[in-house]
Amino acid sequence: MTETGSSLMSDKTPDPSVAAFKEQQDRYRDTVFLPRTGFPMRGGLPKREPETLARWAATGLDEKIREAGKGRPVFTLHDGPPYANGHIHIGHALNKVMKDVINRAHRMSGYEVRYLPGWDCHGLPIEWRIEEQYRKAGKDKDQVPLLQFRAECRQYAAQWVQKQAEDFKRIGVQAEWANRYVTMDFSSEAKIVDEIGKFLLNGSLYRGLRPVMWSPVEKTALAEAEIEYHDIDSTTIFVAFPIIKDPTPAHALNGVSAVIWTTTPWTIPANRALAYGPDITYVVLRVDETNENSVVPQGAKLLVAEDRVDAFCTETGITAHHILYTLPGNGLEGAVCAHPLRGRGYEYDVPMLPGDFVTTDAGTGLVHMAPSHGQDDFMLCRQYGIEVPELVQDDGRYAPWVPHLAGIHVFKAADPVCDLLTEARQSAEHDDAPATGLMARGTVRHSYPHSWRSKAPIIFRATPQWFIAMDGETKLREKSLSALDNVTFVPEAARRRLTSMIEQRPDWCISRQRAWGVPIAVFVEKRTGEVLRDAAVMQRIVEAFREKGADIWYEADPSLFLGEGRNPADYEQVFDIVDVWFESGSTHRFDLGQEGLNFPADLYLEGSDQHRGWFQSSLLESVGTMGVAPYKALVTNGFVMDEQGRKMSKSLGNVVAPSDVTESLGADILRLWVLNSDTNEDLRIGQDILKQQGELYRRLRNTLRWLLGALDGFTPEEAVSYADLPPLEQYILHRLTELRGLIASAVETHQWVGVYPALHGFCTTDLSAFYFDIRKDAIYCDAPSDPTRRAARTVLDALHRALCTWLAPVLVFTAEEAWQARFGEDDSVHLAQFFEPEAEWNDPELGNRWEDIRAYRRLITTELETARRDGTIGSSLEASVTLPLSQEEAGIFGGLDWAELLITSHAETELLPGDTAHGGPQVERAPGHKCARCWKVLPEVGENTEHPALCRRCIDVVSA
């Protein structure tokens, strides 16, 4: 009991002193049924949770759960493999907790849940780590035998698979750990190469020269998902290309130079065309005056888009000009320019070509085309049969055959390229020729792609690579988009993101020029350059990989794979490795559809970056080889930021490691943070936020603790049937049906945002601040056989079972502790099903009435608080309340025990005549004396000579 206050004694009894009243309290203390439980107030989670994990392992809980699930409908969440490199970070924890909650909720909803954790073990990050070790030891990677290097990569990945598994277990993740998959297992490598073979045999796989994202530092192609963007300062240049072929009837382009703007001066040597917009209006302007900083020749005639004239003149220092001609974009068809470095080793004609990608948002409305270094450039030049030069080597330096620039790194080429263009301009001026070369130079700060591993900027570079065709006969793009029509997205907005990426993506470059991975195990006939498409050869490769692993490709004689009748000398054996996104995109082949796992999987759940990564690669592979999407539903979670909304980084000192949280607060706090967040959006975490979660946890724990204490000694025989329950108890049971509906909807839709905040609100607002407060008097002070007390404890039993099972998917350790505190350690809440309210408990009409009652109660408690502040009463139990009710209000609020609901000693209603103004509730000091046992103030206290300090109810209880 929380209320205190001085008592008022009758005229028959002298006013006792405070000490005397306390003596009376002590006399009856043992007759009050106060909560008793061994469930501690403090969780002590950092110490208790590892002990619970050890007990689960010792008792074989995971095996018991698997056994209990057999024969039920199967639910399969296919795990997106994290990279086996370093301890888990907060993003891993977020994702795995979300998966674990969904899995546990399905298990407790009657499903057999199959969840096999996986790891991505190949690729550049692990190579990078081993190379770092070599550099520290003064070793050169190229001097280490390839198979030794691969073995060290394998060992490194294996140790992190084990460490990460322990990290995930520590945060309460339940999975078939002994049945996990890793992409470097021999069986996995065989299935990956089998997937490659399927694309080979259906004609989708081809080798071609195309621009790809290339990391000069790592000397390999990169996938879009391996790219991150950072702001950098780049040199910008305006370059004039003299027009040498004028197709216009009026000779409007005679002596004119077309001007382009670029942020990549290093690509000028690779220029082979200019692009114009067919629907853009262009002008020929004559330069009349320039400022002192401009290098644009006066009198020059320049071609730019009409919409860009003002900006162009400002940026190049042209202060006066006049327009000579205006012409439509399609009027430029057939025009040809000279390369601005003609006469310096670049003897190329530069045709002007129509491009629908050209805009007037920036630059001049004309775009320089370097087909080796841009996707639009490549596609347009290929359409017109223009060569794709190879001028940049894999380390980012110009090749030896590049005039004037050989050996220079492209990121250091701005000055030398500008020097060459300046010489070209000066030569043209000297010869009185059309403007040529550098017209202006500047800088721009913009977002630029970098390798996520090396953090170094990347380039677009045309190299021979292996691709999977998105279009053509297999119609992979079309089929993939169609397959998504049958997929559920959470949130739904993610559908457009994935479909737009597939609509716009180029052919899939799956080759990498690295050592640690699954090789693209194919052969190319040297004479024809054609790839060998032979099912028998492919089958031999798959079987060899299954038995010996991918290393066999590097060890065995090619004849092992080619078989009899083919001379290995006639074939090129390909040693490029496959993109790790192709590997992880193959994982549906590892387990789904076999061993009782569903295919397609019921659910894939990953971060929003996986629309361009695993979600997409998995879809393309599954559709490409099996004709269907590998998933029925896709759930996306946001990224984790710090409390200020900043990205986490060591340099900012704002990194929150899961291990730090579990060691200081406990895994249940971390898990509660996940489910109290809007996981559809980016989340925030930090010390203050975790402190808030700790406070929310404390309230939930206190609710469970009070329930356990109040249920001390409860037996099924004490329970009361629903029909015999008071309306208040029936209302609380109705609220359980509402919450169960919320959970059932979350299980069905995979949308858990808001569910656990609703449960927390129920515990704090409906229970602790309302129902528990009202029923403490009955539970503490009524006789054990009293109908109200029995009814309340009947509901408390349902509340305990409901809250333990409903909280179990999130508070996996605390729910177990609260369950076993009542039912013993031989039982586990994780073997139970969700508590199911009875159908008759669902009473919306009753629920609506009690919402009105609670709203009216809040108005009255406000008046009680006012009376307490002004000294009329000390606590609510010292109050007597009169509630004037209109006829309409009486229909809702009449017939209730308002003293019970308001926790006052007396309350009565007063029916007002129809035309009487409503004066509001009246609060007075209750007449009588304070009962030493229940603390109610009642006139009857003092009537009994044997128990003069008790009320009649308490006398009956202590006398029984």
Swiss-Prot record:
Keywords from the named record: Aminoacyl-tRNA synthetase, ATP-binding, Cytoplasm, Ligase, Metal-binding, Nucleotide-binding, Protein biosynthesis, Zinc
EC number: 6.1.1.5
InterPro entries registered for this protein in UniProt: aa-tRNA-synth_I_CS (IPR001412), aa-tRNA-synth_Ia (IPR002300), Anticodon_Ile_BEm (IPR033708), Ile-tRNA-ligase (IPR002301), Ile-tRNA-ligase_type1 (IPR023585), Ile-tRNA_ligase (IPR050081), M/V/L/I-tRNA-synth_anticd-bd (IPR013155), Rossmann-like_a/b/a_fold (IPR014729)
Cofactor note: Binds 1 zinc ion per subunit.
Domain of life: Bacteria
Main location: cytoplasm
GO cellular component, one term: cytosol
Locations listed in the record: Cytoplasm
Signal peptide from the UniProt entry: none
Pfam family, one: zf-FPG_IleRS
Keyword Ligase: yes
Assembly information from the UniProt record: Monomer.
Family: Belongs to the class-I aminoacyl-tRNA synthetase family. IleS type 1 subfamily.
Protein name: Isoleucine--tRNA ligase
Biological classification of the source: Bacteria, Pseudomonadati, Pseudomonadota, Alphaproteobacteria, Acetobacterales
